Amino acid sequence: MKARSTLLIAAVCASTLTACSSGRDRGPPIQVINRVLATAPGAAQPSTIVAREIEFARAAREEGQITAAARFAAPGAKVHREGGVKDAAAALGSEKNPDISDAWGTAAVVISCDGRLAVTQGRYRDPQGIVGDYVTVWQRQRDGTFLWQYDVSGPDVPQPPPRREFEDGDIVVIAIPSIRGLVASCPDRGEAIPAPPAIPIGEEGKAEAWLSRDGTLRWRWEHREDGIKFVAADYYYNGEWVTAIEESLAPRP
C-alpha cells in the first residue's frame, strides 16, 4: 500500500484503539483534527469525515449502536456480513442494540477531489475484547451531510496477545497515533482523468465496484468463497491511480 499526502494528528493516548475504548468519539479533539487536516484542497476535507465518525460514535454510545447505525445510514446502504452484502435497513431492522457498543477509531481517510465520496479505515474492539479492522464508505447528501453507504469489519487472525496490566509505579510510554488523510488530485481544466485499472468481473451478487461522480475515487467489495470479505479503494493522485485501502477481512465470531 502506498501512502500519499500523509497527515499526522498528535494526541495523548496509549493507542488509537485504547483511546476509543469507551466510544468511537474518544481521540484527538476536533480542533486538532481540523487544524492539521485543513490543508486539503477545496471541499475535500478529511477532517469533515473524521468529525462525522466521531459524531456517529457518540450517537452509538448514547442511543445504541443499531439505532445510531440506522440513523446515519444513506438510502440504499449496505452492510457486509458473514453471509455476504445485505441491505442495511433490513439487516439492522432485525437486530437489537447491544448493551455495550463496539469501540473504534479512524486510522485513514481517502476522499475524492470534489469531496462527495470518502472511504475510512480504522480499528475496532468489540465488548468481548476481540479487535480487528473496519472500512466504511461515506457519501455526501444534497443537504451537505455525510451518511454511510457501506460498512464492513473483521477480526485480526490471530488475535494479538492481551495487553499487560500496569501496576503503580510503572513507567508507561505514551504513543502518538496518526490519521492518514489522502485527497485525490483535482485535474486541470480540460484534463481527462484516465480510467482506473481494470479489475476482474466478479459473480453477480458477490462483487461490486463504484466510481465517484468526479472519477477520482473508486471503491469495491468482494465476498469470496472462503468467507473472506475483501474491500479496496483506489484514488487518482498526481497523474496515476494509487491503492489507498485494501483489506481481506475474516468472518466475525
Regions of interest found by a model, annotated:
Residues 92-135, 185-223, 246-253:
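Surface-exposed, charged secondary-structure patches
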Residues 62-83, 88-90:
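Short, well-ordered alpha-helical segments enriched in acidic and aromatic residues
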Residues 78, 84-86, 125-127, 154-157:
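Solvent-exposed loop/turn segments at secondary-structure junctions
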Residues 21-66, 71, 158-189, 197-200, ...:
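Short, low-complexity N-terminal intrinsically disordered segments enriched in polar/charged residues
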Residues 17-19:
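C-terminal motif of bacterial Sec signal peptides marking the signal peptidase cleavage site
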Residues 27, 131-166, 227-252:
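Short beta-strand edge/turn micro-motifs at domain boundaries
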Residues 1-8:
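Bacterial N-terminal signal peptides that target proteins for export
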Residues 47-48, 57-60, 70, 80-83, ...:
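A structural feature that tracks compact, well-ordered secondary-structure segments
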